[in-house]
């Protein structure tokens, strides 16, 4: 590492970055520089594009700047298989339930957010929409459609919603098409998302 002035970032011949503190020493560990948090390993090398376990919590450092993610999603994977993790107010990775921008969301044990999928949590089934928000008081789905009550718990069987009657087939949900459904020995005509199209049933 070439010698530079204190209080600035320097780059070595391998392209790695370090920071010279005001006392002239290389920064190591977590550092606050210009109101941003950064991490430097014991040799002074700056962490970039890395998820690190520090004091029992996970943190992520930006690929370009090295700044710690705070209140920010980290996106991985390609267009068809994107995965999302989230780092909160203190920069640590969020697991389990959280409220982000007013939306109730959930992160699995591996830290990835449940999106556009059904997931069982604490004995209850939930559905999380494409943006990751929990379905509540509404009908939505991906290949199958579900109704969730105000607490997000999925309900099956006959459901009344917005002055319409729906049948949500247990356990897999309603279809997104017009179809005949046998229910307790009677056949009903159902529309997309399980909406009852006529009140007459045929034996």
Range-by-range predicted roles:
Residues 1-203:
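Extracellular adhesion/carbohydrate-binding repeat motifs centered on closely spaced tryptophans
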């Amino acid at each position: 590492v070439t010698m530079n002035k204190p209080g600035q970032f320097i780059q070595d011949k391998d392209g790695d970055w370090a920071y010279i503190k005001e006392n002239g020493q290389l920064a190591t560990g977590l550092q606050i520089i210009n109101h941003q948090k950064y991490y430097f390993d014991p040799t002074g090398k700056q962490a970039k594009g890395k998820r690190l376990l520090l004091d029992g919590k996970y943190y992520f450092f930006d690929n370009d700047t090295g700044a710690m993610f705070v209140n920010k999603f980290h996106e991985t994977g390609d267009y068809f298989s994107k995965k999302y993790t989230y780092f909160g107010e203190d920069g640590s990775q969020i697991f389990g339930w959280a409220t982000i921008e007013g939306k109730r969301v959930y992160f699995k044990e591996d830290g990835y957010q449940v999106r556009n999928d059904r997931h069982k949590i604490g004995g209850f089934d939930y559905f999380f929409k494409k943006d990751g928000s929990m379905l509540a008081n509404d009908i939505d789905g991906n290949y199958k459609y579900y109704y969730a009550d105000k607490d997000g718990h999925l309900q099956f069987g006959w459901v009344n919603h917005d002055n319409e009657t729906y049948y949500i087939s247990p356990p897999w949900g309603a279809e997104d098409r017009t179809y005949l459904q046998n229910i307790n020995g009677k056949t009903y005509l159902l529309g997309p998302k399980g909406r009852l199209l006529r009140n007459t049933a045929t034996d």
